[in-house]
């Protein structure tokens, strides 16, 4: 699933190309792509038609377009929330595989914005905007914590939350209610950089070490963002269909059997929450039982 850097790459591409444009036509090619929009595909297409795109925003792994739509009495602002799922893509112009296009929108300048999704886990929905902790976010996103790249992210406050958690640190890093945007890849990378094993119970770690993990998460995601994100296959691409190349810089994730770039020990892989965790047994020793 795309994590914060990959979603932010897509958001920036959309911000540059669709802000200020008006949606003139929408077609839903697969009903699963709008299953999260409770009112159904006909309602979504009717409300999107004629809507002006005011801008784009993101929290964690969730992306949305802020729209100005025609209300009953006056224009109202609403959000087109985009969930990329495992393989969702927001593409501008020509699409490499038209068979995977689930939704297409025509803009007033002739641009076609397509939502392609090979596995059909993602989708679009329209949602009201609400103010939460000083930020305007769509209702489905309101429960998410701020992410490490949010200017208002409070590292000390998150550390205090983690100090109260009596489960594995990595499990907490993946909990979007604690800190959003971090997925399996960047959790492993942040833990490697901070020399902390994710199997440690969060509450047993000192504030300094927890803070180091959060700072490492922010650092590695900024670096990934600068390189277009991490693409292990063709499923993650930017709005122009181009893959990121940060996978070449990964220090832990996906490197089972390879030497640690810091100490030379062999990177290990373990099963964790139906996923895989990658770590260095020397730099990141497991907690003592």
Curated annotation (Swiss-Prot):
Keywords: DNA damage, DNA repair, DNA-binding, Glycosidase, Hydrolase, Lyase, Metal-binding, Multifunctional enzyme, Zinc, Zinc-finger. A zinc finger (FPG-type) spans 251-285. Pfam families: Fapy_DNA_glyco, H2TH, zf-FPG_IleRS. SUPFAM superfamilies: Glucocorticoid receptor-like (DNA-binding domain) (SSF57716), N-terminal domain of MutM-like DNA repair proteins (SSF81624), S13-like H2TH domain (SSF46946). Its EC number is 3.2.2.23, 4.2.99.18. Its cofactor is Zn(2+). SMART domains: Fapy_DNA_glyco (SM00898), H2TH (SM01232). Induction: Expressed in mid-log phase. Involved in base excision repair of DNA damaged by oxidation or by mutagenic agents. Acts as a DNA glycosylase that recognizes and removes damaged bases. Has a preference for oxidized purines, such as 7,8-dihydro-8-oxoguanine (8-oxoG) when paired with C, G or T, as well as methyl-faPy (formanidopyrimidine residues) in poly(dG-dC) and spiroiminodihydantoin:C base pairs. Unlike its E.coli ortholog has no activity on 8-oxoG:A. Has AP (apurinic/apyrimidinic) lyase activity and introduces nicks in the DNA strand. NCBIfam families: fpg, PRK01103.1. Belongs to the FPG family. PANTHER family: FORMAMIDOPYRIMIDINE-DNA GLYCOSYLASE. This is Formamidopyrimidine-DNA glycosylase 1. The gene is fpg1.
């Amino acid at each position: 699933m795309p994590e914060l850097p990959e979603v932010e790459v897509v958001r920036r591409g959309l911000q540059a190309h669709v802000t200020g444009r008006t949606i003139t036509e929408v077609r839903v090619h697969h009903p699963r792509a709008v299953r999260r929009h409770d009112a159904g595909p006909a309602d979504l297409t009717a409300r999107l038609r004629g809507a002006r795109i005011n801008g784009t925003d993101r929290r964690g792994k969730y992306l949305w377009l802020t729209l100005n739509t025609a209300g009953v009495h006056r224009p109202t602002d609403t959000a087109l929330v985009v969930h990329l799922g495992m393989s969702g893509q927001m593409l501008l112009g020509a699409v490499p595989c038209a068979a995977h296009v689930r939704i297409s929108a025509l803009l007033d300048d002739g641009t076609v914005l397509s939502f392609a999704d090979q596995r059909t886990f993602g989708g679009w929905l329209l949602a009201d905007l609400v103010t939460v902790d000083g930020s305007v976010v769509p209702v489905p996103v309101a429960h998410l914590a701020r992410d490490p790249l949010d200017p208002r992210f409070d590292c000390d406050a998150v550390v205090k939350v983690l100090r109260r958690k009596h489960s594995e640190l990595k499990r907490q890093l993946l909990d979007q209610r604690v800190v959003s945007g971090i997925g399996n890849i960047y959790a492993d990378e942040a833990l490697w950089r901070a020399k902390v094993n994710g199997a440690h119970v969060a509450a047993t770690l000192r504030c300094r070490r927890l803070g180091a993990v959060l700072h490492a998460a922010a650092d590695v995601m900024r670096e990934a963002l600068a390189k277009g994100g991490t693409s292990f296959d063709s499923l993650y691409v930017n709005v122009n269909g181009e893959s990121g190349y940060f996978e070449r810089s990964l220090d832990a994730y996906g490197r089972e059997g390879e030497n640690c770039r810091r100490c030379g020990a062999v990177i290990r892989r373990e099963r964790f929450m139906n996923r895989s965790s990658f770590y260095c047994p020397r730099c990141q020793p497991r907690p003592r039982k």
